[in-house]
Amino acid sequence: MIPVAEFKQFTEQQPAFKVLKPWWDVLAEYLTVAMLMIGVFGCTLQVTQDKIICLPSHESRENISGAPCQQLLPQGISEQMGGLRELSGLKNNLDLQQYSFINQLCYETALHWYAKYFPYLVVIHTLIFMVCTSFWFKFPGTSSKIEHFISILGKCFDSPWTTRALSEVSGENHKGPASGRAMVTTVTTTGAGSGKVGEGEKEKVLIEPEKVVSEPPVVTLLDKKEGEQAKALFEKVKKFRVHVEEGDILYSMYIRQTVLKVCKFFAILVYNLIYVEKISFLVACRVETSEITGYASFCCNHTKAHLFSKLAFCYISFVCVYGITCLYTLYWLFHRPLKEYSFRSVREETGMNDIPDVKNDFAFMLHLIDQYDSLYSKRFAVFLSEVSESRLKQLNLNHEWTPEKLRQKLQRNMRGRLELSLCMLPGLPDTVFELSEVEALRLEAICDISFPPGLSQLVNLQELSLLHSPARLPFSSQIFLRDRLKVICVKFEELREVPLWVFGLRGLEELHLEGLFPPEMARGATLESLRELKQLKVLSLRSNAGKVPASVTDVAGHLQRLSLHNDGARLLALNSLKKLAVLRELELVACGLERIPHAIFSLGALQELDLKDNHLRSIEEILSFQHCRKLVTLRLWHNQIAYVPEHVRKLRSLEQLYLSHNKLETLPTQLGQCFGLRLLDLSHNGLRSLPPELGLLQSLQHLALSYNALESLPDELFFCHKLRTLLLGYNHLTQLSPDVAALQALSRLELKGNRLETLPEELGDCKGLKKSGLLVEDTLYEGLPAEVREKMEEE
């Protein structure tokens, strides 16, 4: 006997492939097994038993009828028996070899080919059916995609995250504030708009949390591991979807093999119905063997004809059923849009409205999965949802950033508030909202932030920074922050990315915006209305605006500080500045200004002006600053100013003057008449000498002359007895006057980078000057007398 297992190699498949076999493929598989058993059984009988047995006919050649075996038919037998004739056996005078010869000869010549080869044909046709059915599981171009899909599908189905994601979505309206522990929820009712969970899903959702809660110590560790595995699954699903949706080779291959099976079914059915009647029990055989055996006609018995005829009809029945399944498969393939798959029902059941529809081979495989068990596609859809992925990221974040770890990052910022700074995270940990002591929250390069209701736990929050971090704020959270938030800093590539809710924070005192206007909007520089910001005192805008935004005038009645940083783009229209009647501080940095704007001189309340990084060459307009009677700080640094006009003396209320990083070579003597000056910064210029009139600045406390070309200092400079800081580094000084002893308040003296050979020992008389405040080469310091050094090193 030939065991059926020998043919296993033709149809051997991975057990996991069963999920891609709809009911008709399973039925066809069982039918092929039955047909194969028929064929193998017939072949076994054919090989192990006699095929045909022949006896010679004794009638003379002239009397031979058309059918040598006619006398053996039932009618002939009954007639002979009716005569009640006594019969005796006939001697044929043939030996065994002659019988064997006649049997073989008649088998080959007289027996119809269908009767001879029927079992072999059954085996061959069945094997072809098997190959057609499993070909796409073996062909490299399709099997690789199928194996990859089955692998991912099994992991997605078994992943605990699938159940938890469905649970989270279904019960989100009933869940309390999120914590850093496992996000496990028992679904009892369905929230509005979140859909219903299927019965099978609901059972799993309820069972899983019970199992988790029973072992709390293990859950956290396992949840973290499961979260990492689910995160990897999301990436695999994304890449697999992109790869499989590109083509339809699986769909085409399945159609081709089905069409081939249908064609073969019709061919088998036709020729079997035609030739099945050729299987007969008695076979007439006429062969010219009279010279060898003495007989020319024989009557043969096909010993397996009766069994083969029954097997043939049984085989035809199986083939018919098999053909019907193939025809139904073709109907299913062409009647339905199998290259598109919609998750609409899954979206309705789970509430995950962002699950995308898929196409091509991806859609076709999901249709096949639905024929096996639609639960697979429902659970697989979880890993196509961005909502689910974001929740998973949130869970992983909560595990990674515990409240204890976040508290380690707390520190005081420049405004003195307790700040938590988070940078380049995949999301915002829910554990942040457990730190009620946080006063300032800085979020940088965090994608798609959505503030949860837990934001209301940050009762001390007064400052928020969003740097390249888009944020959505629910209405309830807007109400919470509207009167509570005092400072907000927002930075994006373009200003139109700034969230609109920012301009509705009516309790805001400081607004800092950074981003570019699109090229077509830069000249107009349109900004959202600021009318809601009734308490705004500070407005900072870093962009490429062509003019001062008109909406700045919305806060003209209470704005005290305005900063415009234009990154070198020329600011043309500044007339809006005239309306800022209470403005105290104005910064126009890198605005491409070549002259001091006249609109500034209308700001009667102005106290500080900063014109850094512009293209100022002449400051003749400085005379008009006498209208700004409250101006105490003027920063004209980092420009191209070549001289200071004489009427600088009109600025008698000026206390701080910054002229560093310009092209000054001389100073007017009238500068000494600015008697209110306490700080004068002239570093990084080309000054070769100083006017003696600087000694008239009796209020001067800070004088910076570093990085110039000074060769000597006027003795009158040491009349500035209140001078605390004197920076003379990197000049051409060859000596320091002993009159430096008159500077009793001096606490910081820089002399590095000069041509000094010795230091005057009178430095020891500067009571406030210590070693830490003296910046000079070590060799020069060591040249001071020991008692001077000891005095300077005293605490």
From Swiss-Prot:
Stretches assigned to the Cytoplasmic side: 1-22, 138-264, 334-795
Gene3D superfamilies hit by this protein: Ribonuclease Inhibitor
Top-level taxonomic group: Eukaryota
Main location: membrane
Transmembrane regions listed in the UniProt entry: 23-43, 117-137, 265-285, 313-333
Location(s), subcellular: Cell membrane; Endoplasmic reticulum membrane; Lysosome membrane
Ranges for the LRR repeats: 535-556, 558-578, 582-603, 605-626, 630-651, 653-674, 676-697, 699-720, 722-744, 745-766
GO cellular component: a single term: cytoplasm
Sorted UniProt keywords: Cell membrane, Disulfide bond, Endoplasmic reticulum, Glycoprotein, Ion channel, Ion transport, Leucine-rich repeat, Lysosome, Membrane, Repeat, Transmembrane, Transmembrane helix, Transport
Glycosylation, residue list: N63, N301
Cysteine pairings via disulfide bonds: C54-C300
Phenotype of null mutants: No visible phenotype in normal conditions. Impaired response to herpes simplex virus 1 (HSV-1) infection, caused by decreased ability to transport 2'-3'-cGAMP.
InterPro entries to which the protein is assigned, alphabetical: Leu-rich_rpt (IPR001611), Leu-rich_rpt_typical-subtyp (IPR003591), LRR_dom_sf (IPR032675), LRR_domain-containing (IPR050216), LRRC8_Pannexin-like (IPR021040)
Annotated PROSITE patterns: LRR
Gene Ontology biological-process annotations: aspartate transmembrane transport; cell volume homeostasis; cellular response to osmotic stress; cyclic-GMP-AMP transmembrane import across plasma membrane; monoatomic anion transmembrane transport
PANTHER family the record matches: CASPASE FAMILY P20 DOMAIN-CONTAINING PROTEIN, PTHR48051
Domain comment (free text): The volume-regulated anion channel (VRAC) channel forms a trimer of dimers, with symmetry mismatch between the pore-forming domain and the cytosolic LRR repeats, a topology similar to gap junction proteins.
Quaternary organization: Heterohexamer; oligomerizes with other LRRC8 proteins (LRRC8A, LRRC8C, LRRC8D and/or LRRC8B) to form a heterohexamer. In vivo, the subunit composition may depend primarily on expression levels, and heterooligomeric channels containing various proportions of the different LRRC8 proteins may coexist.
Protein family: Belongs to the LRRC8 family.
Reported function: Non-essential component of the volume-regulated anion channel (VRAC, also named VSOAC channel), an anion channel required to maintain a constant cell volume in response to extracellular or intracellular osmotic changes. The VRAC channel conducts iodide better than chloride and can also conduct organic osmolytes like taurine. Mediates efflux of amino acids, such as aspartate, in response to osmotic stress. The VRAC channel also mediates transport of immunoreactive cyclic dinucleotide GMP-AMP (2'-3'-cGAMP), an immune messenger produced in response to DNA virus in the cytosol.
Protein's name in the database: Volume-regulated anion channel subunit LRRC8E
